[in-house]
Amino acid sequence: MTDRLLNGPPVVSPQEWETACQQLLVKEKASTRARDALAAERRRMPWMRVEKSYTFDCPKGKVSLLDLFEGRRQLVIYRAFFEPGVFGWPEHACRGCSMMADQVAHVSHLHARDTTFANVSRAPQPDIERLKARMGWTMPWYTITDGFDADFGVDEWHGTNVFFRDGDNVCRTYFLNSRGDEALGSTWSYLDITPLGRQETWEDSPEGYPQSEPYKWWNWHDSYGVEQDGKWSDVVDAAQAIPA
């Protein structure tokens, strides 16, 4: 009895394995550069003004789409299917949507880049709060009360919409669904689909977009907003001085 894959790849020496890794790394770096270029193109997409008003339920009552930003400029909304008719209701949300919820990065890192994340569903708030408590989810999760899902392409299938707020004006800036959602979950993946991106100096962004040095804005998720002593910046500088 063996655990080896039937007709699997050959088992080679450490030297041969390293050579194969380096050969693949060339293609992986090309893929990363292509992904960065695509994100830069995404940041230059035209926007669509949101003309209608939308209302959601939350634990504290009724809120508007503008309220969902929580004062930040960018908003990422994932449409999770949790409602009557969904497999698992009322104990569970859609299995795929639940996996997505399990993968969401700690939202404090997104907040540090002026970005809010939220889930929306058709389920009433008591059911959502009960589900969140049992599954250990902490992201904001609102109840759709009107035509928001139909208007933004998420009435019959999951999807992620991105919005930007300029004062009280809201624009839709990006949308993806189906397998496009597979890559989401990390802080970077969400920032890369926003109009401002990661807001780091290496990015190709339109002139005037906010940017700061990479790594230096990073923090523990419970320490954003706390005055820093500059030691982390020194660590970053020292690390970047080491030849790659």
Segments (PLM) and residue ranges:
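Short internal beta-strands
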Residues: T116-R122
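Non-globular targeting/processing and membrane-anchoring segments
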Residues: M1-R113, R130-G136, P140, D146-A244
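Short beta-alpha junction loops
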Residues: R122-Q125, G147
